[in-house]
């Protein structure tokens, strides 16, 4: 292969990765100040995409998360996610950059200026969308829209009690299944029951304790077909 052509393809691929991740950032930036009232957004949208989750972070700070994939569908792995937060020019929080997984699994990420909601949510979702595309060959934007539509009108928000660094913390759990009622689910039936759970708490640095996805096996007594879990490990200056 021509080295120049190969380099051009790699550059184009990286631009595409950054642009698709930026789509989530743009969607999440739809704040009331942009002409929408808070009542135009569902409680789940406000909790996931619009809450000032970084309000309890003093920059500079690094948030570290563990990531685990498991299940009978294919091989699993353990990896890490790191979010670096820096002060804005006016000293407020935060400008952010991230490292989502490592090696060949690494997700190219855009830096986020003036972040208020925790970008790790958007990064996790973009990773998830890529995986749905890889496993089903379905269009990434289709899955992206299904998630956003379900967060708007089909998600459940409930109070929750979690543990962080060995201590109980109060928070909220947002759960939804974006593909369950999809008329096109027959195209990816094996993964159509996928469930998403967001564990959120103001007592945790960055407001996100964890994110979990789960696809149950066809048999109730069989282990899950696929699980992915991101959990906060801690924060350091």
Give the residues covered by each predicted segment:
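Intrinsic-disorder/low-complexity regions
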Residues: 1, 18-19, 39, 78, ...
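N-terminal secretory signal peptides that target proteins for export/translocation
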Residues: 1-16
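Bacterial N-terminal signal peptides
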Residues: 21-32
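Surface-exposed, glycine/proline- and aromatic-rich loop segments on solvent-exposed faces
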Residues: 106-131
């Amino acid at each position: 292969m021509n080295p120049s052509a190969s380099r051009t393809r790699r550059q184009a691929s990286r631009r595409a990765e950054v642009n698709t991740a930026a789509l989530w950032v743009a969607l999440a930036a739809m704040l009331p100040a942009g002409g929408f009232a808070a009542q135009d957004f569902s409680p789940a949208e406000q909790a996931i995409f619009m809450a000032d989750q970084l309000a309890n972070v003093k920059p500079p700070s690094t948030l570290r998360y563990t990531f685990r994939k498991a299940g009978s569908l294919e091989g699993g792995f353990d990896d890490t996610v790191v979010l670096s937060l820096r002060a804005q020019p006016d000293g407020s929080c935060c400008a952010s950059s991230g490292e989502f997984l490592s090696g060949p699994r690494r997700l190219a990420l855009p830096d986020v200026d003036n972040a208020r909601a925790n970008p790790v949510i958007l990064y996790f979702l973009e990773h998830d969308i890529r995986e749905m595309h890889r496993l089903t060959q379905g269009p990434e934007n289709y899955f992206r829209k299904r998630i956003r539509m379900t967060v708007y009108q089909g998600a459940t928000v409930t109070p929750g009690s979690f543990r962080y660094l060995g201590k109980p913390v109060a928070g909220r759990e947002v759960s939804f299944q974006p593909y369950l009622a999809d008329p096109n689910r027959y195209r990816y039936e094996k993964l159509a029951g996928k469930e998403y759970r967001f564990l959120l708490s103001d007592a945790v640095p960055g407001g996100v304790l964890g994110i979990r996805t789960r696809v149950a096996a066809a048999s109730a007594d069989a282990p899950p077909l696929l699980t992915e879990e991101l959990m906060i490990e801690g924060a350091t200056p």
